[in-house]
Amino acid sequence: MSEKENNFPPLPKFIPVKPCFYQNFSDEIPVEHQVLVKRIYRLWMFYCATLGVNLIACLAWWIGGGSGTNFGLAFVWLLLFTPCGYVCWFRPVYKAFRADSSFNFMAFFFIFGAQFVLTVIQAIGFSGWGACGWLSAIGFFQYSPGAAVVMLLPAIMFSVSAAMMAIAIMKVHRIYRGAGGSFQKAQTEWNTGTWRNPPSREAQYNNFSGNSLPEYPTVPSYPGSGQWP
C-alpha cells in the first residue's frame, strides 16, 4: 500500500511549506465514530474562532479604558492555542479512534481536561488573563457600555465551548470504557513504541488475518498402493 500524502492543513500551492498531517474521516475513522470525531474537529474550529473574537473584544476593552495587557495575552492565546489545540488534543483523539489506541485516549483525556479547565477560566473572565469572560464584561458596563457589549460575545462563546468540551469528553470516555480500554493497554503501547504512530484498524486487521494459506494450496501427494508400508 502506498503511503498516504499529507493533506492538512490545506495550504495554497504557492506556499513552500507542505501539509503536516493526513486527515480523512471516511477513510480512517470507523463509521460508528465518524460523527463524534467530526464534532470534536468542529469544536476545535469553534474554539479557534472564539479566540479570534476574544482578540477583537480585548481590543475594544483596551480602547474603552482597559489594560493593554489583556489584548497582548489574547493575541498570544490565539497564536498558541490554535495549532496546539489541534496537535495536542484533536490529533490524539483522531488517532485513538483510528487505531483504538489506549495511549492516545489517555493523552486526550489529560490534555483535553486541562483545556476544559482553562476554557472555564476564560469564560469566567478574570482580569489580566487576556480573556473577555463574564466578570470582565459585566464589570466594564460602568466604564464603557459599548465595549462591554462587545466583550459579552466571547464570554458567551467561551461558555458554549466549555459546555461542548464537557459533553465531548464524557462521550469519548463512555466509548473508551465500553471498548475495554485501560491504563495497562496504554502502558503496553508506550513500552512497545506503537503510541507514536499507531496503525489503523484496517492495517491491524490485515496484519492479524494475513494469508494463513497460499492462494492455491498444494494438493498432497500420497504414495501409490504398492508403496504403503
Swiss-Prot record:
What Pfam families is this protein classified in? SCAMP
Kindly list the GO CC terms recorded for this protein: recycling endosome membrane; trans-Golgi network membrane
TM region positions:
40-60, 61-81, 105-125, 149-169
Q: Name one GO biological process term.
A: protein transport
Q: PANTHER family, from UniProt?
A: SECRETORY CARRIER-ASSOCIATED MEMBRANE PROTEIN 4, SECRETORY CARRIER-ASSOCIATED MEMBRANE PROTEIN SCAMP
Please report which protein family the annotation says this sequence is part of.
Belongs to the SCAMP family.
Q: What is this protein called?
A: Secretory carrier-associated membrane protein 4
Q: Which organism is it from?
A: Homo sapiens (Human)
